[in-house]
């Protein structure tokens, strides 16, 4: 087995794009190594079924999260090129994301067990928070002129990937689902942007669409990075 990578403090957040790719390569390459060498940190000795299931789960989760991010980039780029050129929709746009109150667990380096649980819960909450806007994008908003064929097909892909990734993570970590839902309710992490997207005021409508696609791109980027990080933690216990 290749030696576990070492990250001190939060240095692994440096250069997110390159780091995300590196983590994916580390996770997938070492998962393949586990096919020939027992991974005692994850499964009981000799439990090949458990080992194979975990390999499939982690590889699949990483592929899904990367796919969601790439599709979200495509959606944002398509809208930006068509409707946002020369506009100032980007000003303070990050302040408008409905997931801003969804914070990463603090002091993640101090207790690996709490870190794992906290990050898995955070990932599920992020997925839950995007169910409604993505669903309404492919239903109530699909006939809007701003929702191009590219955006609509990409949104449908994201709905499918979100459901698949959510089910994949919920299956082995079902014990955190209730707490995640409860925390979202208490923090009021919900999306209420439909009215602005249906506004008769074109500039307001375009600003709302820009914010939606910007926030989706931002959040799926985080989702991709931390899904890979959790996978790395579960495999090596220390990344």
From Swiss-Prot:
Q: Name one GO cellular component term.
A: extracellular space
**Which is a Pfam family this sequence falls into?**
Hormone_1
Tell me the CDD domains matching this sequence: prolactin_like
Q: Which UniProt keywords apply?
A: Disulfide bond, Glycoprotein, Hormone, Secreted, Signal
Task: Note the SS bond partners.
Answer: 97-215, 232-239
Per the UniProt entry, the glycosylated residues are 70, 92
Output the InterPro entries linked to this UniProt entry: 4_helix_cytokine-like_core, Somatotropin/Prolactin, Somatotropin_CS
Family matches, as PROSITE patterns? SOMATOTROPIN_2 (PS00338)
What biological-process GO terms show up in the record? cell surface receptor signaling pathway; female pregnancy; mammary gland development; positive regulation of biosynthetic process; positive regulation of lactation; positive regulation of receptor signaling pathway via JAK-STAT; response to nutrient levels
Subcellular location per UniProt equals: Secreted
Q: Enumerate the transmembrane spans.
A: none
* A GO molecular-function annotation: hormone activity
- Signal peptide start-end: 1-36
Purpose = Placental prolactin-related proteins may play a specific role during gestation.
Into which family does the record put it?
Belongs to the somatotropin/prolactin family.
This protein is called Placental prolactin-related protein 4
GN (gene name)? PRP4
């Amino acid at each position: 087995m290749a030696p576990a990578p070492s990250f001190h403090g939060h240095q692994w957040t440096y250069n997110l794009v390159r780091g995300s790719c590196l983590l994916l390569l580390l996770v997938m390459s070492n998962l393949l190594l586990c096919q020939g060498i027992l991974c005692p940190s994850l499964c009981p000795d000799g439990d090949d079924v458990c080992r194979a299931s975990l390999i499939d789960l982690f590889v699949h989760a990483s592929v899904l999260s990367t796919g969601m991010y790439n599709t979200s980039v495509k959606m944002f780029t398509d809208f930006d090129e068509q409707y946002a050129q020369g506009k100032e929709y980007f000003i303070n746009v990050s302040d408008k994301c409905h997931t801003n109150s969804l914070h990463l667990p603090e002091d993640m380096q101090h207790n690996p067990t709490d870190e794992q649980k906290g990050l898995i819960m955070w990932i599920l909450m992020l997925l839950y928070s995007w169910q409604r806007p993505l669903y309404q994008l492919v239903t109530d908003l699909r006939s809007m002129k701003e929702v191009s064929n590219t955006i609509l097909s990409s949104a449908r892909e994201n709905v499918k990937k979100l459901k698949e990734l959510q089910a994949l993570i919920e299956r082995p970590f079902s014990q955190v689902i209730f707490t995640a839902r409860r925390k979202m309710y208490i923090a009021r992490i919900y999306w209420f942007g439909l009215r602005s997207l249906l506004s008769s005021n074109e500039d307001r409508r375009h600003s709302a669409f820009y914010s939606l696609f910007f926030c989706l791109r931002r959040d799926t980027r985080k989702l991709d990075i931390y899904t890979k990080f959790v996978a790395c933690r579960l495999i090596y216990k220390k990344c």
